[in-house]
């Protein structure tokens, strides 16, 4: 599935949990920018479905997705949420490892923090 990462990101942005579930492997591992880790379909789906609706003003803008062979992809994007009534934009890179069946087996999230 060449467009698996794009489908996954669109489903995250639109809170389409059925599509997210279709895109991920049973043994998915997600490692967040602060070392937080969720392993397995159940834990990951519970985390993401609980978190996303709580983010006020959430928006995702995908700049590009780059596939490296059949096993890895990189997504450059930004996520925006409202903080104290003002939009806060966070640039990110997500690194995806893809399983043999094309589903997402691992997601590593890296964020760009402001200097200071």
Describe these PLM feature segments.
Residues 37-46:
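Short beta-edge strand/loop motif at the mouth of beta-sheet-based domains
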Residues 13, 31, 45-116:
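A beta-strand edge to alpha-helix "cap/lid" segment located at domain peripheries
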Residues 14-31:
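Short, well-ordered alpha-helical segments enriched in acidic and aromatic residues
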Residues 6-10:
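Amphipathic alpha-helical repeat scaffolds
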């Amino acid at each position: 599935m060449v467009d698996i990462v794009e489908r996954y990101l669109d489903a995250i942005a639109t809170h389409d949990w059925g599509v997210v579930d279709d895109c991920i492997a049973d043994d998915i591992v997600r490692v967040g920018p602060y070392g937080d880790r969720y392993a397995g379909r159940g834990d990951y789906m519970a985390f993401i479905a609980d978190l996303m609706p709580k983010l006020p003003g959430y928006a995702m803008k995908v700049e590009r997705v780059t596939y490296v062979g059949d096993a890895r992809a990189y997504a450059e994007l930004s996520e925006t949420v409202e903080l104290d009534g003002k939009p806060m934009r966070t640039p990110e890179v997500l690194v995806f490892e893809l399983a043999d069946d094309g589903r997402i087996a691992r997601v590593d999230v890296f964020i760009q923090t402001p200097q200071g």
